[in-house]
From Swiss-Prot:
Keyword Zinc carried by entry: no
Family matches, as Gene3D superfamilies: RbsD-like domain (3.40.1650.10)
Family note: Belongs to the RbsD / FucU family. RbsD subfamily.
Provenance organism: Enterobacter sp. (strain 638)
Record's protein name: D-ribose pyranase
Enzyme class name: isomerase
Subunit-structure text: Homodecamer.
Cell compartment(s), UniProt: Cytoplasm
Any one GO biological process: D-ribose catabolic process
Role this protein plays: Catalyzes the interconversion of beta-pyran and beta-furan forms of D-ribose.
Length: 139
């Protein structure tokens, strides 16, 4: 049995294949996933697992250089937005780098998911609980 943080074989595999600037999406239960993009569906029921639970596990193994959020999260889900900013701050300290945070419209966000290596769908059912993570390097 694997001893590391990520036990899900699909998530572990996609993270291990990421190169510098490749992207990975963690999303809520409602984000449409392009047919051309690998979907890793973790959703069991509403809220399980939560967006933050999935993000915590993914970022424990992934070196993150940039995070992209929909601008709408600021107005429509401010509590999660603040939680995300705190998570990114802690991740910066753990990784020893600065993580750039970019905002885009939700429509542009959805278009950008088509270029991602995979979309990991959580059971989250709150608005705009989505993030695009851009891979950094560990050296």
């Amino acid at each position: 049995m694997k001893k590391g943080t990520v036990l899900n074989s699909e998530i572990s595999s996609v993270i291990s294949r990421l190169g510098h600037t490749d992207t990975l999406v963690v999303c809520d239960a409602g984000l449409p996933v392009p047919h051309s993009t690998t979907r890793i569906d973790m959703a069991l029921t509403q809220g399980v697992p939560s967006f933050m639970q999935v993000l915590d596990v993914v970022t424990a193994e992934m070196q993150v250089e940039t995070a992209i959020l929909a601008t709408e999260i600021k107005q429509h889900n401010p509590q999660l937005h603040e939680t995300l900013l705190g998570h990114i701050e802690q991740l910066q300290q753990h990784q020893g780098n600065t993580i750039e945070i970019r905002y885009t419209t939700h429509e542009q966000f959805k278009q950008q998911t088509a270029d991602s290596q995979a979309v990991i769908r959580s059971g989250e059912c709150s608005p705009y609980a989505n993030i695009i993570l851009c891979a950094g390097v560990t050296f």
